[in-house]
UniProtKB/Swiss-Prot annotation:
Keyword NADP: no
Primary role: Part of the phosphoribosylformylglycinamidine synthase complex involved in the purines biosynthetic pathway. Catalyzes the ATP-dependent conversion of formylglycinamide ribonucleotide (FGAR) and glutamine to yield formylglycinamidine ribonucleotide (FGAM) and glutamate. The FGAM synthase complex is composed of three subunits. PurQ produces an ammonia molecule by converting glutamine to glutamate. PurL transfers the ammonia molecule to FGAR to form FGAM in an ATP-dependent manner.
Primary location class: cytoplasm
Stated name of the protein: Phosphoribosylformylglycinamidine synthase subunit PurQ
Length: 227
């Protein structure tokens, strides 16, 4: 399986994402810069955290118009796994690949610590490696992770089981304690916590690795079935 890590000006978690795939998952991975226009040959797309374009205007608002984004949207429409973490989640929201928006954290402070999450839906291509209702600990690092949507959208997210991860503690004021959601099809996931920073027991936590092993397992199963 071949992964693309999209690199925007100001991305600072691209190397972590690359390491998680190459060394944690043992799969092929390449950096793809924002100036590129094609993702041909890649099986999954990863949008890492950071401060793309300095987070000017809004987080992800400028990156959304990068030359690579039409290819990201095309990959999502083709059913390929697309994962946006932290700033990557914000870019997916700005691009309309996921519903809702991000606001400043409710206390107006940057939060950088390991938090407790609950796996709300383990039937997605990103979460099948977890148990339903499992509690996990994953690092966060953001100033604008306060997820917002209208009540109708929130009800729809719940009804369609699009909420994959939920905070199990106060973190940023996110509506419904949402930490990660998918699109209706289930192949695009945006999450504020950083699973790529929790893939090695050597560093004290490997509970994020299952996000990536889930993607790989789903891809292998679908390709074996297809063949």
């Amino acid at each position: 399986m071949k992964f693309a890590v999209i690199v925007f000006p100001g991305s600072n978690c691209d190397a972590d994402m690359y390491h998680a795939i190459k060394d944690g998952l043992g799969e092929e991975v390449e950096y793809v810069f924002h100036t590129e226009t094609s993702l041909d040959g890649f099986d999954a797309v990863l949008l890492p955290g950071g401060f793309s374009h300095g987070d000017y205007l809004r987080s992800g608002a400028i990156a959304r118009f990068a030359p690579i984004m039409p290819a990201v949207i095309q990959a999502a429409e083709a059913g390929k796994p697309v994962l946006g973490v932290c700033n990557g989640f914000q870019v997916l929201l700005e691009a309309g690949l996921l519903p809702g928006a991000m606001k400043r954290n409710i206390d107006l402070k940057f939060v950088c610590r390991t938090v407790e999450l609950v796996v709300e839906n383990n039937e997605t291509m990103f979460s099948s490696g977890y148990e339903q209702g499992q509690t996990i600990r994953i690092p966060v690092a953001h100033g604008e992770g306060n997820y917002e949507c209208d009540d109708e959208t929130l009800a729809k997210l719940r009804e369609n089981k699009q909420i994959v991860f939920r905070y199990n503690e106060h973190v940023n004021g996110s509506k419904g304690d949402i930490a990660g959601i998918t699109n209706e099809r289930g192949n695009v996931l945006g999450m504020m916590p950083h699973p790529e920073r929790a893939t090695e027991t050597l560093l004290g936590n490997d509970q994020g690795l299952a996000v990536f092993t889930s993607i790989l397992r789903n891809w292998r199963e679908s390709h074996v079935t297809a063949s």
